[in-house]
């Protein structure tokens, strides 16, 4: 789950920095890494207050081949910016200790940004522990790049949505789950589904959901979907129950997947996999019903080519609605996966 920090006033920057550094401390980041993270959060938060007038910082831990990192997304609907100009040191928040967006890029282990004028900006920064990177063993290159965001309903601390992705042998298994309602009982249902997925994530999607259905009987139930993405066969195998949306989208068109009616843990119809071709250059997007389904990435030129985390943040910014938890995951086959 991402921490959500509204950035409407300079006083909110310090709280975002404090909570982000606490997160890094729980991950046992070293002092240098915590310092880099503090500067990044300060710069991005200050930029939102000064130049966007409003906006949000989304902060979460993220697992990777080299260990865990902290992901920071700065999201706004402001006037947009000239990224090439603003990435020069000192151009944006030049009176802070880090000297602007250029410093954010330099301090980050991963960095990306996208902006339209008008239309707003999303900046992505990931900060990894130097110690974790140093001790990590060489890992095979992951075949899929992804970005995922999960945020609780307004006023809630716990989130009834969750997601997971497991990559093995050129395949990825992806889960999105939405516990009924929101709050602690919804979170309990979602965690039961996540445990069923984690026990054997590479099983056929219908088998994963059947196992989750059986293990969730004591909960209030959930909507959930599982997709198995195959980079070599260029195929997506999908099964879902309830109100989870999934779509393959590219510059040429979209293809949506249908879920079975019902609720895992309560009552659900026959769970059956469907396999469809994965067109080259298409993204796979799956989300809970906390995100509206009437989105079209093609309406924003350049967005389809962005880092999946930036696309996920853009969708959350523009299409979240109502008082519900929301989760979205965006997956792209890495360069060279589609031979």
Per-segment meaning from a language model:
Residues 1-39, 137-167:
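Bergerat-fold GHKL ATPase/HATPase_c domain
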Residues 185-253, 258, 271, 331:
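Catalytic core of PPM/PP2C metal-dependent serine/threonine phosphatase domains
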Residues 79, 179-186, 290-295:
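Short acidic, Gly/Ser-rich segments with clustered Asp/Glu that frequently serve as metal-coordination loops
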Residues 129-180, 185-195, 267-269, 273:
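N-terminal entry segment of metal-dependent catalytic domains or homologous docking segments
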Residues 1-5, 45-139, 168-174, 229-231, ...:
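Conserved beta-strand-loop-beta-strand hairpin that lines the nucleotide-binding pocket
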Residues 4-9, 13, 210-220, 279-339:
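C-terminal catalytic subdomain
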Residues 139-160, 209-217, 242-275, 279, ...:
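PP2C/PPM family metal-dependent serine/threonine protein phosphatase catalytic domain
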């Amino acid at each position: 789950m991402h921490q959500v920090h509204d950035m409407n006033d300079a006083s909110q920057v310090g709280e975002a920095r404090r909570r982000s550094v606490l997160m890094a401390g729980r991950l046992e980041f070293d002092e240098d890494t915590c310092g880099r993270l503090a500067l990044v959060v300060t710069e991005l938060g200050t930029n939102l207050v000064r130049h966007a007038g409003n906006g949000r910082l989304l902060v979460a831990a993220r697992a990777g081949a080299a260990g865990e990192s902290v992901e920071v997304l700065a999201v706004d609907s402001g006037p947009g910016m000239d990224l090439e100009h603003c990435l020069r040191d000192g151009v944006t928040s030049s009176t802070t200790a880090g000297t602007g967006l250029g410093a954010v890029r330099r301090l980050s282990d991963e960095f990306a940004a996208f902006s339209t004028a008008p239309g707003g900006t999303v900046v992505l920064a990931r900060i990894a522990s130097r110690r974790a990177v140093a001790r990590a063993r060489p890992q095979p290159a992951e075949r899929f790049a992804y970005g995922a965001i999960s945020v609780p309903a307004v006023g809630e601390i716990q989130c009834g949505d969750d997601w997971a992705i497991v990559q093995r042998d050129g395949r990825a298994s992806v889960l999105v789950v939405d516990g009924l309602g929101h709050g602690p009982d919804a979170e309990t249902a979602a965690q039961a589904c996540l445990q069923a997925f984690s026990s054997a994530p590479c099983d056929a999607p219908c088998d994963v959901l059947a196992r989750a259905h059986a293990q969730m009987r004591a909960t209030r139930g959930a909507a959930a979907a599982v997709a198995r993405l195959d980079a070599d066969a260029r195929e997506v195998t999908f099964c879902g129950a309830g109100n989870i949306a999934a779509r393959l989208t590219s510059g040429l068109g979209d293809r949506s997947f249908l879920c079975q009616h019902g609720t895992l843990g309560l009552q659900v119809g026959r769970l059956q996999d469907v396999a469809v071709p994965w067109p080259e250059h298409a993204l796979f997007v799956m989300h809970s019903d906390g995100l509206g389904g009437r989105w079209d990435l093609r309406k924003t030129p350049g967005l389809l080519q962005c880092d999946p985390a930036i696309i996920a943040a853009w969708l959350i910014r523009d299409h979240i609605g109502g008082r519900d938890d929301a989760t979205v995951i965006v997956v792209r086959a890495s360069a060279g996966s589609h031979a």
